[in-house]
Amino acid sequence: MKVVVTGFDPFGGEAINPAFEAVKKLPAEIAGAEIIKVEVPTVFGTSGEKVAEAIETHQPDMVICVGQAGGRETVTVEKVAINLAEARIPDNAGQQPSDVPLVEDGATAYFTNLPIKAMVKNCHDHQLPAAISYTAGTFVCNDIMYHLLHLINTKYPTIRGGFIHVPFLPEQTIDKPTFASMSLEAITDSLFYMIEAAVKTQEDIQLQGGTTH
């Protein structure tokens, strides 16, 4: 089995992006699956193109994209991506789209086909906090997830894929004292256990979850 794992470059004035820093620290193999690491630009459209190129090149069985969500308290795996670009800040190419679809005539939204409950439970079983998120935002993280799932739903039906958000690193919050952070080691371990569960689990487990707001 091959798993492509992508991580973004720094954006929004940050000098580092914990997403790719953690991806780089993953081992070359997890649960018998080859881990292929790819850095992608924080740019609308281009990030999805890089995923398409990685799929063409490596022919993976699974693609997991990883991005930074400053302000989140823990690693979160995303349930859904929506067909909308709404950028509060410019991307790394200076684009700042507002209220435009990511794919003309594309589906309104796509659900991940990863076993996200099993992924979260595997983190909990190893004493690591983790959660399911029901919004990937409207910036490039949602963009890459939507384009990945669009490819899966229209061209690569046997591939499983989805997106994981990670918090700031402690050094990123020195001037943001109210923001949560997580060590690079803990983020990397969380990614490892999420990927391990995704590789080992075909049918997701039954586990009560959800949010009230």
Swiss-Prot record:
**Which reaction is this enzyme known to catalyze?**
Release of an N-terminal pyroglutamyl group from a polypeptide, the second amino acid generally not being Pro
Q: Where in the cell is it found?
A: Cytoplasm
* PROSITE patterns reported in the protein's UniProt record: PYRASE_CYS, PYRASE_GLU
Which keywords, in A-to-Z order, does the entry hold? Cytoplasm, Hydrolase, Protease, Thiol protease
Primary residence: cytoplasm
EC number per UniProt: 3.4.19.3
**Enzyme active site:** 78, 141, 165
Signal peptide positions (record): none
GO aspect biological process, one term: proteolysis
The record's annotation in Pfam families points to: Peptidase_C15
Query: What NCBIfam families does the record tag this protein with?
Result: PRK13197.1, pyro_pdase
Q: Which family does it belong to?
A: Belongs to the peptidase C15 family.
What's this protein's function? Removes 5-oxoproline from various penultimate amino acid residues except L-proline.
MF-aspect GO terms: pyroglutamyl-peptidase activity
Q: What is this protein called?
A: Pyrrolidone-carboxylate peptidase
InterPro entries associated with the record: Peptidase_C15 (IPR000816), Peptidase_C15-like (IPR016125), Peptidase_C15-like_sf (IPR036440), PGP-I_bact-type (IPR029762), PGPEP1_Cys_AS (IPR033694), PGPEP1_Glu_AS (IPR033693)
- Judged by the first EC level, this protein's enzyme class is hydrolase
